[in-house]
């Protein structure tokens, strides 16, 4: 189970009507079945790189449920390669999915929420949007962009009754890494001892962040000091990453 399904499950369990989106229609329907609450869930195929598809699912959601109270941008994939060797076409595709897809969805749903007078947009970003990761620099760049667009939109929309929350998980135990686009220059900069957190923990943090109207949610909490450490002493964090890359940990 990935982060998206875990979020859908916890929101459905809390009583929300939920629409699940993914490129693969069969995969989305299977997730809907596992989540349950089929009387108030909907599974739709959508490629967020295509604005017309986003507009279509927004219209279908309004047709079925009359309003959109929460929109969660979670589509994305990793990319593992060095800045020197990264394939530019793959780089652009990663930005199309991870960043421009989220931006397009925000532009599609904001007018709906403005008309309602309320709504929440939740962008699933990453700690990598605070601390750039070597050999994951393109992925980090998409998350830095996601952090900026979410926090900027939060200020712009403050008087519209629309809240924007940015969620930054650390390492999560999913197939995300295995499904990442891999180039020719790959090195590990995460110690093998780091197990990561569960998707259920991320989903609960998302729900609590929504209920509390948070500006940003970092999960696990232990990532907060790491982010502050990088902000205050970037050289120290960079040194540790260079050491891990050299040792191939």
Describe the residue ranges of each PLM region.
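Canonical Rossmann dinucleotide-binding motif of NAD(H)/NADP(H)-dependent dehydrogenases/reductases
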Residues: 1-17
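Conserved glycine-rich Rossmann-like NAD(P)H-binding loop of the short-chain dehydrogenase/reductase
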Residues: 14-30
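The beta1-alpha1 cofactor-binding region of Rossmann-like NAD(H)/NADP(H)-dependent oxidoreductases
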Residues: 25, 46-56, 88
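Active-site helix of classical SDR
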Residues: 106, 142
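Residue(s) in the substrate-gating loop at a strand-loop-helix junction
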Residues: 126
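Substrate-binding pocket helix/loop in short-chain dehydrogenase/reductase
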Residues: 82-83, 87-92
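SDR active-site lid
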Residues: 159-221, 239
